[in-house]
Amino acid sequence: MQNITQSWFVQGMIKATTDAWLKGWDERNGGNLTLRLDDADIALYHDNFHPQPRYIPLSQPMHLLANTPFIVTGSGKFFRNVQLDPAANLGVVKVDSDGAGYHILWGLTNEAVPTSELPAHFLSHCERIKATNGKDRVIMHCHATNLIALTYVLENDTAVFTRQLWEGSTECLVVFPDGVGILPWMVPGTDEIGQATAQEMQKHSLVLWPFHGVFGSGPTLDETFGLIDTAEKSAQVLVKIYSMGGMKQTISREELIALGKRFGVTPLASALAL
């Protein structure tokens, strides 16, 4: 029998959650992570599935995700513990044929359930599937320290925030030319914040929740982690810059345009125009 804990997707989730914990982005039960799978990914592991998978209805139907499996982090679970007990802290779920709910096929033992941010994740998956023609498969939410800090001192405006991050590190425009979406502060774990996040995910692969954290999307766990890591590194540089009295020189608009041309990306126009 194949052991699902040795599968590429469980091992990938272990690495991503452990790395995020070591970065200091996911204290206690902070943060959540979901990866969209294919039936072929889980086909070898049916013997590992629960004999009677629990069924949980969704608060709103997700027709686009019908019959789709995911691996998800659990509600109230600590990222630091995923590596110690994957089955207790992760779960493989599969949305039913009409998108009304999902079965927990593996993991989430002792009656655990998926992350409370599952509505935000599933809604964002729907939008990123449409925006990227199915390329994006990962949604990651974490409490990246310096990005959160900047939401207290920068104008919480997409163009302003994006331009500052682009100027904070040269690679940022190349990694996220589509910029960073920003929400107003909202109560987490609700359909409302999920819908607002998904709306921004139509246009941006990164979405900030002021005074809370960040959502990122990408085609793989590595790409999504790297996206957030790149933005967070720039935020760290900016925090140091502001603590030293602010910028005396920076990357100019003309230089940002040249950077975009060199790497074949189209920078967010509103951020470039500032």
From Swiss-Prot:
Zn(2+) binds at residues 141, 143, 212. Its main location: cytoplasm. GO terms for cellular component: cytosol. Its cofactor is Zn(2+). The active site is at residue 117. Signal peptide: none annotated. GO terms for molecular function: metal ion binding; rhamnulose-1-phosphate aldolase activity. It catalyses: L-rhamnulose 1-phosphate = (S)-lactaldehyde + dihydroxyacetone phosphate. Its EC number is 4.1.2.19. Catalyzes the reversible cleavage of L-rhamnulose-1-phosphate to dihydroxyacetone phosphate (DHAP) and L-lactaldehyde. Homotetramer. Belongs to the aldolase class II family. RhaD subfamily. This is Rhamnulose-1-phosphate aldolase. It comes from Shigella dysenteriae serotype 1 (strain Sd197).
